[in-house]
Amino acid sequence: VGEINAYHMPNDFFSVYRSEGEAKMLPNTWHQVGISLWGRISDWRYEAIFTSGLDAERFGHNCYVHYGATSPYEYKLGNVYAGAARIDNYSIPGVRLSLSGYYGYTFKNTERKASASYDKVHGALAIGSFGLEMKRWNWIVRGNATYSHLADAQKMTTFMNAYPKHTQQDGSPSKHSPIASNAYSVGLEAGYNIFSQISSLSDKQKLYLFGRYEDYNTYAAGKQKVAYKYDRVKRMAVG
């Protein structure tokens, strides 16, 4: 889901940073046990997976669902389930266009039991993402746009904050942090191979002059949005 989980090797991004926005709001190099189906038909590559859901106890205002795939225990719980899918298209020479999505429940995916008042709380998480890459004419251009909605965010925040922190005997591994109901990340980077203009180097090496711009918010909507305005970040980088 997202560019960061499909194309995360060092030659898939400029500088030493992956997409900072996606890295903040999504699990990175996301791996979970599940059942997966993938393949390719002509210019289309597809992949789908059924797996356990994320753990809402690990969510937070400045990381959204980033830590949801981790576990504070020596094992990973699977009380709730989720599905994800991805399609990559290569119809245009040198260009990849991608769509990916995720949907699943996140609440009660922990050892902590909830009272009957939370029976209808599921913490449904939906993520949609678009990505692109172009490698032509000595240019590399990459872009990503990811949006997510989390249902029951306020009710889950109340549930998490009702328990002591993990440092106490009966504590919870929760971050005790408000959880956003929406988060987003958009980014664009472009680099030009300047060695392509030097005949003695054009066939041997590559040196890219690049720039990147990102705009992301891990607390784009929520009851305490005013208090967490700093979770919106605009970032520029050149190299």
Give residue spans per PLM region:
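Surface-exposed coil loops of outer-membrane beta-barrel proteins
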Residues: 1-88, 105-108, 113
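Outer-membrane beta-barrel pore domains
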Residues: 94, 98-239
